[in-house]
Amino acid sequence: MKKKIVEYEVGEQVDVFLLIKTATKGLASNGKPFLTVILQDPSGDIEAKLWDVSPEVEKQYVAETIVKVAGDILNYKGRIQLRVKQIRVANENEVTDISDFVEKAPIKKEDMVEKITQYIFEMRNPNIQRLTRHLLNKHQNEFLEYPAAMKNHHEFVSGLAYHVVSMLDLAKAISALYPSLDKDLLYAGVILHDLGKVFELSGPISTTYTLEGNLLGHISIMVNEIGKAAEELQIDAEEVLILQHIVLSHHGKAEWGSPKPPLVKEAEILHYIDNLDAKMNMMDRALGRTKPGEYTERVFALDNRSFYKPTFHN
């Protein structure tokens, strides 16, 4: 079986086809331009540098371009990189489709839809159920395709839906332990909290922020979407305001992007569930690339820590 990019170890030679996920221009200390490219295949991605690039080269190596790369793997300041020795744009007859190079959620879309639909079916509050079903149906196609973020966690095709499914299972388990929680509110908050990402992000491949995403952000976008849905469904009840608050506060603090802190119980729990699932995804993916007895590369979003994989963990 062909080796995946995350399976290569430091010092190994690489000669593979990869997809350029992003390409960012920089200026070296000698004043010459270079490109930082993130290269990917279905297993994940790796950073590489292209030095002394000309304007012509910059135009060649852009996001969503499939390239043939030869080089070796190195560890630079705790991060795994691909040192490029040769690179060229792939010919049409050498590769099939971009979708063959992107990482995808480990659960099928239809299975995720079925699971989320069941959680909505279990809701007993008609206002919460109608609002949630309406908004999910309205944006379902994008919801099932988009990543949950540009980087850090669930940044792969269908990552948004996968994040939500994992959070719903966490919400169910926590609600069983703490029956005073309003399951309808918590489930709806989980499903809707990041739905604004379908406006904030450009799409599932070579993801960037849209103009709306840069100027408004997914939180305020979703608060407005809930308000519009309530008008369309002629729902004038406190549930609308509480759902808006849950979405508005799910980052927890102003410095993390929420204008208000959680002020209802379900909003507080949603914040912790969201944080837990995001961090578990980051740790699992980093440790999945690591041998027992070794440390992961540094995980920037987790305080730039390297995590140890015990020798008794395979």
Curated annotation (Swiss-Prot):
Where is the HD domain positioned along the sequence?
Answer: 163-279
**EC number(s) on record?**
3.1.-.-
* GO molecular function terms noted in the UniProt entry: 3'-5'-RNA exonuclease activity; nucleic acid binding
Family listed: Belongs to the YhaM family.
Q: Does the keyword DNA-binding apply?
A: no
Protein name according to UniProt? 3'-5' exoribonuclease YhaM
- Key word Hydrolase present in the record? yes
User: What is the species listed in this Swiss-Prot or TrEMBL entry?
Assistant: Bacillus mycoides (strain KBAB4) (Bacillus weihenstephanensis)
Name any Gene Ontology BP term. rRNA 3'-end processing
For this UniProt record, the keywords arranged alphabetically read as follows: Exonuclease, Hydrolase, Nuclease
Q: What does this protein do?
A: Shows a 3'-5' exoribonuclease activity.
Q: Which InterPro entries match?
A: 3'-5'_exoribonuclease_YhaM, HD/PDEase_dom, HD_domain, NA-bd_OB-fold, NA-bd_OB_tRNA, YhaM_exoribonuc/phosphodiest
Note the superkingdom of the native organism: Bacteria
